[in-house]
Amino acid sequence: MKLQKRKKQYGTVGKYCGRDLYIKRTGRGRLQRRIGLRRGKNRYLCLAIICVCLLATGGLLFEMRILLGDREISAMASAAESDSASGKEASSFPGEKASLSLFDKTDELLAQVDRAVSQYDYDRAVELLAGNGADKEDPRIAEKLSDIEAVKKTLVEQDIYRITHIFFHILVEDPGRTFLDTAQGKGYNSVMTTVPEFEAILTQMYQRGYVLVGIHDLAEVSEDETGMEQMRAKKILLPPGKKAFVMSQDDVNYYEYMEGSGCARKILLDDCGKPVCEYMDQDGTVWIGEYDLVPILDRFVEEHPDFSYRGAKAILALTGYNGVLGYRTDETYDPASPNYNPDMKPNPNIEEDRAYVRELTQALKEDGYEFASHSWGHRDYGKIELEHMKADIDRWEKNVAPLLPAPCDIMIYPFGSDVGDWRPYTEENEKYRYLQSLGFMYFCNVDSRPYWVETGGQFLRQARRNLDGYRLWMDYGCGANRLSDLIDVNTVFDARRPTPVGWK
């Protein structure tokens, strides 16, 4: 498998997935796994694995009892008594048969129902309860249906035109290597958010009742009363006190120029198929763990499923000139391509990387993430000439779109620079018309206001708010009060930042 080859490349031993032998906790409780780059360590790691496996085998029955608790012990005792009364020899593991009743179809079904309800998918929960997998005689089914119907009566429809949209860039793991006293370091300090800041933002927004939705949950193109196709608002129903919001992350490409800057350098899949990040520390040691938005958000939603509406996660905005997600997949890295750039370091594994990225984007889609174009070369679409914009987006369609699991209909403008003003797009707008011809229907610019959403024709436009160093500092150090509806910036701002924070 490709992932196995990648692991061998770094001299790793064993699997990494969830809470296994190689997991290490940091002070913030984030899960990490250190990858030993020195071959001499591998022998000791192997010995450690063998010892732990022997201990784990000996303690298996004990752990099963802990996990199943009194119900299993009771079931085992009942099974033993039944065997004794019938004259049968008692099973060495009498709870083996009884455990089937503990995890029967109805139990599994109710767990799925609870998950759907926790993420506000009440219709899905009712469908599950009405399906063939339920034991209709089980009183829990009727009770659960009654509970769901009672909750549905209290739901409040969200006004899609008052839904805020926040965004981030690649998160900073080591500010000491990122926020240097250089032009680039000052730029990072302005536009980037640290890992502790992001974690605090998630926690505070959750505590304030915010619920993460996808941009496609806001509206979709459908026929109106006259048979015309129009972008029409959808219903988002949430309990009282809950507030919908959208999240996105720009430049999820892990550019070459960011190498060694204290940030993650790629996304990959662990042995359970879950997205994690690769990070190299100052000593050159490679770590796998929660070093950027995706795995941190995944863990937060796993712990707080009611933070996500029907499993929605963030929009990942991709350019193309350095490849995507940390892999140099663009044709400019391909010596066999007529568009190969000799100034680029060629990627001899480009086809393998492209195949792996397709696998990765499919996994991210199934995990609730959406993808957006951020142009190919991070161009200012609001300012450049039409022909230059066409050439740029055509390169994105050629090099990035084929790596995605579905057609991309979201455009997140670089620099927040829209191709139109505040008035609705019209067919006279040639830039919009060309983007629309490629299938783009959702367009995002940047604005510091709490919300701005516009629909018309076959488009939805939404402004985004930057929760970066500059915006945090303007509230924290200058009293701007632009973020108080979301967070308490005094408890979010990372004191490791150099101040004041200027605009890049």
Which sequence ranges carry the predicted segments?
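Gram-positive cell-envelope targeting signals
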Residues: 1-101, 105-108, 113, 125, ...
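Generic recognition of cysteine residues
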Residues: 17, 46, 51-53, 263, ...
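C-terminal active-site subregion of NodB/CE4 polysaccharide deacetylases
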Residues: 110-111, 117, 123-218, 231-247, ...
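Short loop/turn hinge sites at secondary-structure boundaries
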Residues: 87, 120, 224-225
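Short, glycine/charge-rich beta-strand/loop segments that flank catalytic centers
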Residues: 217-225
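Metal-dependent polysaccharide deacetylase catalytic core of the NodB/CE4 family, i.e.
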Residues: 161-181, 226-229, 238-245, 252-419, ...
